[in-house]
Design a protein with these regions (language model features):
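Basic/aromatic-rich interaction segments and small domains that mediate binding to polyanionic partners
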Residues: 25-60, 69-116, 128, 136-183
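Bacterial signal peptide processing site
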Residues: 20-22
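C-terminal motif of bacterial Sec signal peptides marking the signal peptidase cleavage site
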Residues: 15-18
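Long, charged/polar, surface-exposed segments that mediate recognition or autoinhibition
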Residues: 119-130
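Membrane engagement elements in two modes
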Residues: 10, 24-25
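Positively charged n-region of N-terminal signal peptides that target proteins for export
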Residues: 1-5
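Sec-dependent N-terminal signal peptides
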Residues: 6-13
Length: 183
């Protein structure tokens, strides 16, 4: 009888151990479907360093230190989050599609890469369809990846600190465009 109870208890313990929840799991599988972008490996917070040659905006709508609400869904918890402006820069900003250097699925329509994060891009805007090499590390496998420009626009881009709607604190997020912010 004791042996049967021991076996039954062991089986129950094994079965129940598969039901536990790891609350420290911070992978990006909870991000849901955000367009065709794959956000696995996304570097939510950045170092705060800006690419060489990126020019500070002369007269940005949102000044450094001011607050705005993000109206973009590059990442889970971003849309509707309150942000503090850390930097404002005038440049050409691109949405790109690329295959990570680490392998895996092609990332489509990644927003945003700035002109200064493209290898040998020069200072003139590039046209959609142009093949480029990325010098950014917003996501794993991005730096050095071959990419195709999906769209391009002259814009003021912002580096922001914000608390995601799920409570995660994000520092120095690169990049949010002026059109993706509201007061």
């Amino acid at each position: 009888m004791k042996k049967q109870l021991f076996i039954l208890g062991t089986i129950a313990a094994i079965a129940l151990s598969g039901c536990s929840t790891n609350t420290k799991d911070t992978n990006n599988s909870s991000m849901g479907n955000m367009g065709s972008m794959n956000h696995e490996g996304m570097h939510h917070s950045g170092s705060g360093q800006v690419p060489q040659g990126l020019q500070t905006a002369a007269n940005p709508k949102y000044k450094v230190g001011s607050q705005a609400t993000i109206k973009a869904d590059h990442m889970a918890g971003m849309n509707g989050a309150k942000a503090t402006i850390v930097g404002a820069y005038d440049t050409t900003v691109y949405a790109v599609s690329y295959t990570p250097t680490t392998g895996g699925e092609k990332v489509k329509n990644h927003k945003w890469i700035v002109q200064e994060e493209l290898e040998h891009a020069g200072d003139q805007p590039l046209k959609p369809g142009t093949e480029v090499t990325l010098k950014a590390d917003h996501m794993e496998g991005m730096n050095g990846a071959k990419a195709t420009i999906d769209s391009a626009e002259k814009a003021t881009v912002y580096m922001v600190d914000y608390t995601a709607t799920d409570g995660q604190k994000v520092k120095n997020h690169q990049w949010v465009t002026e059109s993706e912010l509201v007061k």
